[in-house]
Amino acid sequence: MYGLQRSGTNYFETLMHLNYPDATFLNGDLRNEITHKHFRLYPDKSIIPEPQFDNTLQVPDFADFEQQLGTAAPDLYVIISKDPIGWYTSYLRWSKKNNWPKVNHHYIEEYNMFYGMWMHYATQTHKILFVQYKTLLKNPDAVLQKVAAKLHYPVRDAITNTRKVYASKRFTDKKKQDTLNEAYRSELSEVELQDLYQHLNTEVAAFLGYTSGR
């Protein structure tokens, strides 16, 4: 599993462990290790926003990536994404809360590169499954069934859901509805929203299933 911070990776992992306790996840302890779920694979390392994620590794193709993983390479790569606006507003709050260094680029450019790299890899393998966070919230059964089928796990008739997410505060119904109703859009002015759209790679967004930044 891979995804940028604030994309819903913890939520997905929690659901998987509840429903498939034997499922294992590739997630190294160090944030600059290729096995870490937030590892920055994109080639332009100058936009890495937080020093703990700094790395110089260049893995231009999926074969190079799996060669770096070696025997740790999993059977399936689940890539979790949030819609660009939802991700950006959450990421911006997170960067301020954790006192990240100021950057000279728009954060959405990292979104473009992170998911753009996985989009590129997806042209070279069938081992990658892209999952939208909102789909995970609205229809977790369908998502887990799809994952289970790809991993040859038994498909469950009904899944166990959760409000408690590892490494996160209690996930309330209000937070869920705010996300589904896109309440976060009110955090950006029209100027800020247009600035985001100007920097957003619409090809990457469309590939992930988001149109007009959604």
Where are these regions (language model features)?
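Generic detection of long, well-ordered alpha-helical segments
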Residues: 6-9, 108, 137, 141, ...
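PAPS-dependent sulfotransferase catalytic domain
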Residues: 60-158, 171-182
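Short catalytic/ligand-binding loop motif for oxyanion handling, primarily in non-cytosolic enzymes
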Residues: 7-13, 33-34, 85-90, 137-141, ...
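Secondary-structure transition/capping residues
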Residues: 23, 27, 98-99, 158, ...
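PAPS-dependent sulfotransferase catalytic core
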Residues: 1-56
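PAPS-dependent sulfotransferases, especially Golgi type II membrane carbohydrate sulfotransferases
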Residues: 92, 149, 153-214
